[in-house]
């Protein structure tokens, strides 16, 4: 079965317009809508990139059927994996089960803003693997403690 999606162009449109656009996409019959999770737009001329998680939360409340998803959220540098799990779990409740979390290792354009440098590719992949392990454990329920190579989590629960 073919599913047709709509991209919320966060680098080209403000947050209020993005929510109006996803409502229109739902009315037009699109099956899902995705958004990038960028701090900066790809090009300086594009203005600013709204915070994807606030836009998704507003879209979840403004729609009833359309699925919502992040293209790639990087749970390793700009966000801690436990915080990503909390954001995703909250959005899943707001969207009444319509949210899907897309994860990846990110890119320097958006992840450098919190400092700490830009790790080598093999390190970013290690970090992503560990982050996915933490997020999965939190989604599974119960208390989670994790003391790994890149991340620590102490008695966290969703």
Q: Where do the model's predicted regions map?
A:
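Active-site-proximal loop/turn and secondary-structure-junction residues that shape catalytic pockets
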Residues: 10-12, 39-40, 74-76, 105-109, ...
């Amino acid at each position: 079965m073919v599913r047709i999606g709509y991209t919320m162009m966060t680098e080209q449109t403000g947050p209020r317009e993005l929510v109006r656009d996803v409502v229109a996409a739902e009315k037009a019959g699109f099956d899902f809508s995705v958004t990038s999770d960028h701090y900066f737009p790809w090009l300086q001329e594009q203005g600013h990139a709204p915070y994807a998680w606030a836009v998704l939360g507003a879209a979840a409340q403004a729609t009833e059927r359309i699925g919502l998803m992040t293209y790639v959220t990087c749970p390793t540098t700009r966000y801690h994996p436990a915080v990503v799990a909390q954001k995703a779990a909250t959005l899943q409740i707001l969207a009444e089960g319509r949210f899907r979390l897309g994860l990846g290792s990110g890119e320097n354009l958006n992840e450098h803003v919190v400092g700490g440098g830009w790790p080598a590719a093999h390190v970013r992949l290690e970090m992503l693997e560990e982050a996915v392990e933490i997020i999965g454990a939190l989604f599974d329920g119960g208390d989670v403690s994790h003391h790994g190579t890149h991340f620590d989590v102490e008695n966290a629960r969703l």
